Structures are given as C-alpha cells and as structure tokens.
C-alpha cells in the first residue's frame, strides 16, 4: 500500500537523490548532488513554480515526481508538467505511478485556477515509460521539443 503526500523542504536531499538516480538511469547523466539538492530546495523557496509528490510505503519514499506549471493563454488554464518521475526499482510494476497519476487528476480538479491538462516528456528510447503513460490515457503530442541553455 502506498501513501501519497506533498513533499516538504526536509525531503529535498531524498528528492535530489531520486533525481540523480533517475538522470543516471534514463540518460546516463551524472548530476552534481549538491546542485540537485539546491534545485530541489529551490522549489520550496518558490512554491508558485510547482510541487513534488511522494509515494511512501513503510516510511520509505518508493517514488517521487515533480509538477511544474505552464500557463496556456489558448486554454485559459494551466498545464501541469509532470517531471523527474522516479520509482525505485524494488517498487516498479506495482501500480505506484498509476496511483500518483490518478491522485494528480484529483488534485487538478480541485484547484482554483483551472488545470487544462497534463504534459510530460519521455526519452525517445524509454518504451516502458511511454507504454505506462499511454495506458493511463496520455498520447504523444505533435510537438518537437527544442532547448538552448542560457547559463
């Protein structure tokens, strides 16, 4: 059984560890743990940017994800971007992400600012993640993502 809760600032080191594990596993990237911790802590200093959701079992953080906000002037509502999804290997294929996703839907419906949808991106070769997202009702978009670092 998984209990869900919104993360608190004291969770930042664990969130950073999950982010480091996820980056290494999915992209073979080694994140600087100090920077990852500052990144997690930074969200708690600016809650208007989003929140983390944690799934726990027996006081162990089995899974975490980050939600950030994007305003859509076309829809007069927010898209919730689901990011930094990490489920510890021992808890995979047990429905934890599905439970988290369903909980996000419930949260979205209760917000004072309308949430018009969820978005996320997945590595192109991460077929397992893509299958999970499709099984929950998501579909691939017709957009191509571009990026340029400014720091």
Model-derived features: where do they sit?
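Conserved beta-strand in the GNAT
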Residues: 54, 60-69
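Conserved active-site alpha-helix within GNAT-family acetyltransferase domains
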Residues: 98, 124-142
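A short helix-loop-beta-strand connector motif used in the catalytic cores of GNAT acetyltransferases and
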Residues: 42-54
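A short, internal acetyl-CoA/4′-phosphopantetheine-binding micro-motif in the GNAT/acyltransferase core
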Residues: 85-92
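Conserved beta-strand-loop-alpha-helix junction that forms the acyl-donor binding cleft
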Residues: 114-129, 147-151
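A short beta-loop-alpha structural element at the N-terminal edge
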Residues: 3-15
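Conserved GNAT-fold acetyl-CoA-binding loop/helix
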Residues: 20-41
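Conserved acyl-CoA
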Residues: 88, 99-116
């Amino acid at each position: 059984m998984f209990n869900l809760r919104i993360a608190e600032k004291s969770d930042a080191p664990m969130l950073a560890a999950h982010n480091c594990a996820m980056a290494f596993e999915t992209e073979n990237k080694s994140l600087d743990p100090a920077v990852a911790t500052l990144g997690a802590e930074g969200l708690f200093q600016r809650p208007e940017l989003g929140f983390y959701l944690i799934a726990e079992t027996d006081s162990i953080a089995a899974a975490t994800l980050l939600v950030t906000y994007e305003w859509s002037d076309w829809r007069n509502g927010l898209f919730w971007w689901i990011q930094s999804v990490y489920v510890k290997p021992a808890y995979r294929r047990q429905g934890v992400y599905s439970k988290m996703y369903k909980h996000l839907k419930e949260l979205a419906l209760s917000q004072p600012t309308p949430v018009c949808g969820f978005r996320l991106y997945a590595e192109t070769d991460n077929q397992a993640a893509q299958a999970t997202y499709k099984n929950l009702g998501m579909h691939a978009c017709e957009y191509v993502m571009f990026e340029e670092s400014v720091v």
